[in-house]
């Protein structure tokens, strides 16, 4: 899963995982808050919070088949050789290169596959405005 705008305006699970890692280091020292800890919290931890262990948050037989792939090439990753997970969290991809949700390709080569994105965003804006008008 990914964070929603109710808790983080960016809707970026990567940013939330990175923030968790950095805050753990700030609170408990540089050795605390490893990249693997943050990845575990973001994947299996999120599944546990939702009561969906074994279904989401991992790649295993019987899981729904969600996966995101990031490219770790380019200038941002120039010195990040030893630990790709640490590099991923510290150097920060802007968006996934490929994303598969429930076994279906959603992002290919950094582009959304659906040709309905503009329609979905238009509908989202209308619904968001309706919701926000009730808050006011």
Language model: regions and residue ranges:
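His/Asp/Glu-enriched, well-ordered alpha-helical/loop segment
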Residues: 1-74, 90-91
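Generic structural signal for well-ordered, non-membrane alpha-helical segments
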Residues: 10, 35, 39, 113, ...
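Generic recognition of well-ordered alpha-helical segments
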Residues: 16-19, 45, 95, 101-102, ...
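C-terminal cap of metal-dependent C-N hydrolases
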Residues: 64-121
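Short, solvent-exposed cationic patches
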Residues: 121-136
